Amino acid sequence: MNRPEEHVSPLIKRRYPRYELETELRASNLGAKQRGVMRGRSLNISEGGIAGVFTTGWDVGTSVNLEFSVPVTSYPVSIEGVVRSHTDYQYGFEFVGLMPGQRELISKTCRTLALLE
């Protein structure tokens, strides 16, 4: 008996689970093309990256500094990232070069958000 393929949400078919996180997301280019800080909104976060919406943006492969708030600390998180995807105004950033403390903070954030789902 053939079964039709079930639709699986893109949030489920990822290397890391995604968790909804709505907060201000600030990004600035690293390197030669400085445009200042761009402000957007985050959509979701995982241990590997964060997705957000911006009215203007970057090409895939662009290195950026990301700054955003998380529910497990009172100070903003600042992490280096790379644009891995974008569709219209939505951008996917992969975290790169995480220090152990940053990695633990993102992991703790994801564990906390998982409990809130």
Indicate where each model-derived feature is located.
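Residue-level preference for beta-strand/loop junctions
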Residues: 17-19, 34, 60-62, 75, ...
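A residue-level detector for short acidic-glycine micro-motifs
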Residues: 27, 44, 83-87, 97
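N-terminal helix initiation/capping motif
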Residues: 1-45, 111-117
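Short beta-strand-centered aromatic/proline hotspots
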Residues: 38-40, 77-84
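Short, surface-exposed secondary-structure edge patches
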Residues: 16, 53-58
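Short solvent-exposed strand/turn elements
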Residues: 58-60, 93-112
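Short conserved beta-strand and strand-loop elements enriched in small hydrophobics
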Residues: 23-30, 62-74
